[in-house]
């Protein structure tokens, strides 16, 4: 057997096989299995841009701006705080996003794409097609884009895990009780948009009241929560408004309901005007009416030319929305009508556009872009790529011939690690190091638990637990972490392998030793090949948001929160991609291994700490015990007859006995005939956590 990967000959399903980077992936055996002609696909999408349909005619004969808005609004729901939202799942097809006011008429964009999706079928996801359409739209209008990666996977129902806000109505003002703001306009975490139903800021101004400087403050918060800095904010705002127009040449009161509320005969289309003509020049979407630039189907620097060459005044659109229009503009600088080139109209700016002119920091950047069109094009192309790929995960997940070669810091780059080394020899060195089971398991867990299935960031690969900011996180117990790393790093150096591999291998060894102490001989699967990230290629501010505020698996809360400890555990469980039964078995195992944060004894329902037994579940479900509050969210476990305190516990521990679903799992693991199943299931879930970010093994 190759020593590149370890396997057990036991009865556990997880012990047989296990992919390693040294084995052939499916693509090596069947390299043509993807079978998507990407060049032909791009040609079809490009042709779509100028193939205007009578049922929803293209502005100026070009659908580019509509496709860009669709892609922008798909990707723009991403928020860095929890990694949720974004364009990697095609969630714009479902409620609530398909019916948000800010997404009005994007249902038409997706219907225009349907013939292409129908043609290519399963070879491309809706998520990929939506983002590709926006990127190709820019290319068709003259922008040299930075690149594009396939690899997004569709979901097939509305997402239930995303908190979009507490409001009960669309576009509720921030002054209304129960909203998303508190204090001095402090936006609730993890939200990024300023209103329910918007992607980012209100284009008319804060709560619909024009004031560019106030809007600039909203923009800075919103874009920062989308992982964008000031330069990227200016580039995206200006680049997004270089092409296309707003639609408000009509009466918004005549629009029908959104797609989710539309009549069955409307077949999923919303905002239909069944009273008057509501297409072309008469379409109503945001209520603002007009184009930003003189040539709305051409990539150029016209946005900055108009913004800075003219004074602007507030006016109302035909639909009654606030917008800015130029004073004394030359006729030749006006964009032509979307249907009749003999007619010209005033261009417009939103309050967000005017923020680029009035906010001092934004203006500096905008003036630089105005003077250097090439710099603007490059900055926008990079920002657009980041916007549309931020939630796609590391570069190893990118698919296709248009992937840019350059590694970008926001991709959290990790170099490839070695796979050709003697795993058993390294494990022997770790075993001789004197580290405890608790130290080995806790360190590996802390390294891996940062993984988020939402945007596929974090995880053990890269061993960023040894770098800032993670090496100072309270949840990682910095003093203990430093002591453990002082032992493991020399082992990695002596073996010329990554610290990341050694950390995980040490955790696996700890689990094996604990299983042996419980009377079960197993070998935890291990796949070498992790690399070590560098501090220089780690964006500290970007990683700050991955800091755990609580970890139910290690029975720890950083401080008191409005939500319960068990709710925080469920949120982390969902982000890590774990199921209810995996959560259950991991908590029970981690407790008996003595991995509680700070060495607390809460929930350690065993007299055999360090042995991977099912004692936690046996004692949790034992009716000889009673449970009593003891203050500060803690509980005592007492003998029912004597009243003697046997253990202490937290709400996290009690929920596995009180919740009917979790108790059902707990009872399974408490059974006398499931002691080995408990070990096997723990190892399976453990292995899933340790390899959650090993996308190189999933190709």
Swiss-Prot record:
Cofactor: heme b
Active site residues according to the UniProt entry: 73 (proton acceptor)
Covalent crosslink: Tryptophyl-tyrosyl-methioninium (Tyr-Met) (with W-72): 200-226
Cofactor info, note text: Binds 1 heme b (iron(II)-protoporphyrin IX) group per dimer.
Record keywords, A-Z: Heme, Hydrogen peroxide, Iron, Metal-binding, Oxidoreductase, Peroxidase
Gene3D superfamilies the UniProt entry points to: 1.10.520.10, Peroxidase, domain 2
Catalysed reaction equations from the record: H2O2 + AH2 = A + 2 H2O; 2 H2O2 = O2 + 2 H2O
EC number of the protein: 1.11.1.21
Enzyme class at the top of the EC tree: oxidoreductase
GO biological process: cellular response to hydrogen peroxide; hydrogen peroxide catabolic process
Pfam families: peroxidase (PF00141)
GO cellular component, one term: cytosol
Function: Bifunctional enzyme with both catalase and broad-spectrum peroxidase activity.
Assembly and oligomerization: Homodimer or homotetramer.
Alphabetized NCBIfam families for the sequence: cat_per_HPI, PRK15061.1
Protein name, entry field: Catalase-peroxidase
Organism (species): Aeromonas salmonicida (strain A449)
